[in-house]
Regions:
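Conserved N-terminal phosphate-binding loop of PLP-dependent enzymes in the Aspartate aminotransferase
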Residues: 2-235
């Protein structure tokens, strides 16, 4: 069973609290491995070293990238529990022999080690845990807008979903470009947000070193930008 710990590109959608515990219980009862994709939530963004710690998952394997090297050089990895890792070991004729051309690339691995040393030394995971609620609470005030159907997230990653009708949760037609217009308004004011979820959601994922004052600026700019576009559509 392979799944993102929290849906990312699909719209920044955290799972219900009971989801991963139930998945793990069912899988382990049927001898099925659980694999969490931690490419987005790994290495601090969720407010813990790994996102599965936030959502009650107990994976056998995890996929890792992005935060492993902070993007300075391309680096990915797989983490495995002993009972999975040990299955690859053995003597001649027993070990699982496999390789890849760029596996264990020394330069990329050195960048990853240096990156993780900085994250640990500067306590950036703890910083995400501290600033995450501040970001989520600030963005939560945007729910007062008529076209904001949901604000959700964990740690220093959040999604803002735009809807035509809050009661029905109906989206705007893609051709109306509501999220794109808000993005452009925000960009003119110095804040960049990324469109996800089929163009109906903005992702807010600031760097770990963002300050509370800068978070206030992000919230203010998005509030202004949403207000401008709302008026254009008659709200």
């Amino acid at each position: 069973m392979l799944g993102e710990t929290m849906i990312g590109t699909g719209g920044v959608i955290p799972p219900p609290p009971e989801y991963w515990p139930m998945v793990c219980e069912i899988c382990k009862a049927n001898d099925v491995l659980v694999i969490n994709d931690e490419v987005i939530t790994g290495f601090g963004r969720a407010g813990t070293w790994f996102g599965f710690e936030q959502f009650g998952s107990d994976p056998d394997l995890i996929t890792l990238a992005k935060g492993l090297s902070s993007g300075y050089l391309p680096l990915g990895a797989v983490g495995a529990k002993d009972h999975v890792f040990d299955a690859f070991l053995g003597g001649p004729g027993e070990a699982f022999m496999s390789g890849a051309t760029y596996m264990g690339h020394p330069l990329c691995c050195a960048a990853g080690i240096a990156n993780l040393e900085i994250v640990e030394r500067e306590k950036l995971v703890e910083r995400c845990a501290e600033l995450g609620p501040y970001l989520q609470d600030g963005l939560g005030t945007l729910r007062s807008h008529a076209i904001v159907g949901d604000v959700r997230g964990v740690g220093l990653v959040a999604g803002i979903e735009y809807v035509k009708d809050k009661a029905t949760r109906e989206w705007f037609a893609p051709a109306q470009g509501v999220a794109a217009k808000i993005r452009d308004e925000a960009f003119q004011r110095g804040v960049f947000v990324r469109m996800l979820g089929g163009g109906h959601v903005h992702a807010v994922a600031p760097p770990f070193i963002i300050s509370k004052e800068q978070i206030d600026t992000v919230v203010r700019v998005l509030d202004e930008s949403i207000g401008v576009v709302e008026k254009q559509f008659g709200y």
